[in-house]
Amino acid sequence: MKDEDKTKIINAVTNLSTALKKYHPNTETCNYVEITLTELKKKDGKAFTGAFLYFLTKASMLRTSENVSLNDTESKLWHKMSALKNLGNDFFFGMGL
């Protein structure tokens, strides 16, 4: 993954985290996004890509199970962040898939 792609993802997760802290501060979803953001900042390469792709799945399931209803701002940020999953296409390179 290119450095600029990693930066886009970090910025998107940061923006979502900020919004969740404002509108849903005491939810597991908010806490998970914040913890994952800290972890993503420490990772590079395939470890970063794998962690981000896992995060997308788990965060979505957690949000659904908690019945967190996103407002318009959060929804736009969530979709913007989720759209970046295509940047993780390098994850399976060389695995014959």
Describe the residue ranges of each PLM region.
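Charged, amphipathic alpha-helical oligomerization/scaffolding segments
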Residues: K8-N15, Y32-I35, E39, Y54, ...
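Intrinsic-disorder-associated interaction segments
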Residues: K2-D5, I9, K41, G45-F48, ...
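Amphipathic alpha-helical binding modules
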Residues: T57-L97
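Short terminal alpha-helical segments
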Residues: M1-C30, N86-L97
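Amphipathic alpha-helical interaction modules
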Residues: L20-R63
